[in-house]
């Protein structure tokens, strides 16, 4: 496992990951991998190499575009911590609130606090998000549902940093969201993986 992590080290750095935080990233991935058989945090059929190439690098693709000077962030549907834990490791000065309704996954995320002490773990997304400056998510819900979950935050000018896949699907989601949120302003940025031929986009609201 360590071999593939070291093999991808240049890619992590190329994408903008903090070299000093690589030991924490490795510790998180080892914990995620060792816990997966019991908790099913990611597909049990997935190899460690696929975990890095399909998930970790996926999360890092837009990391250079993460809003500057953010002090408090939230991640919706955090699951096994992709991207929430990775971003908390990358940005240790950001108080990162992870929202995950599964009790088992919450328990796992609480174990990650020893690796990234700036993490705060919660269950359901509350009606009002206090002090949050940006919301992240990956492979969670459609755009309109994410906005519905955080309607009060959105109305107050909240920012969203959403990792999505196919452009066609994104266009459908945005069209539906615009029916509910007439003033919705969206920017869709293509992302290019250096290790896989996959269609990825960053949705900024």
Curated annotation (Swiss-Prot):
* Signal sequence, start to end: none
Spell out the Pfam families in the cross-references.
Answer: GidB
Q: What UniProt keywords apply to this chain's record, in alphabetical order? A: Cytoplasm, Methyltransferase, rRNA processing, S-adenosyl-L-methionine, Transferase
* Cell compartments where the protein resides: Cytoplasm
GO terms for CC?
A: cytosol
Q: Which reaction does it catalyse?
A: guanosine(527) in 16S rRNA + S-adenosyl-L-methionine = N(7)-methylguanosine(527) in 16S rRNA + S-adenosyl-L-homocysteine
Instruction: Please report any disulfide bonds recorded for this protein chain, giving both cysteine positions.
Output: none
SUPFAM superfamilies membership: S-adenosyl-L-methionine-dependent methyltransferases
Family the entry assigns: Belongs to the methyltransferase superfamily. RNA methyltransferase RsmG family.
Q: What does this protein do?
A: Specifically methylates the N7 position of guanine in position 527 of 16S rRNA.
- Write the protein's name: Ribosomal RNA small subunit methyltransferase G 1
Q: Which organism is it from?
A: Bdellovibrio bacteriovorus (strain ATCC 15356 / DSM 50701 / NCIMB 9529 / HD100)
Lineage summary: Bacteria, Pseudomonadati, Bdellovibrionota, Bdellovibrionia, Bdellovibrionales
């Amino acid at each position: 496992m360590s071999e593939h992590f070291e093999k991808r080290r240049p890619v992590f750095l190329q994408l903008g990951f903090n070299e000093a935080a690589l030991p924490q990233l490795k510790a998180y991935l080892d914990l995620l991998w060792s816990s997966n058989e019991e908790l099913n945090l990611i597909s049990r059929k997935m190899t460690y190499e696929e975990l890095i190439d399909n998930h970790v690098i996926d999360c890092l693709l837009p990391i250079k575009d993460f809003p500057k000077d953010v002090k408090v962030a939230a991640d919706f549907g955090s699951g096994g911590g992709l991207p929430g834990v990775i971003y908390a490791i990358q940005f240790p000065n950001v108080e990162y609130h992870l929202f995950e309704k599964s009790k088992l996954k919450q328990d796992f995320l609480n174990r990650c606090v020893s690796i990234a002490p700036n993490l705060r773990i919660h269950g359901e997304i509350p009606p009002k998000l206090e002090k949050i400056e940006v919301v992240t998510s990956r492979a969670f819900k459609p755009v309109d549902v994410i906005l519905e979950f955080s309607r009060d935050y959105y109305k107050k000018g909240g920012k969203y940093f959403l990792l999505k896949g196919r452009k066609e699907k994104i266009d459908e989601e945005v069209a539906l969201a615009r029916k509910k949120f007439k003033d919705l302003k969206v920017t869709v940025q293509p992302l290019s993986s250096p290790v896989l031929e996959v269609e990825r986009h960053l949705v900024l609201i």
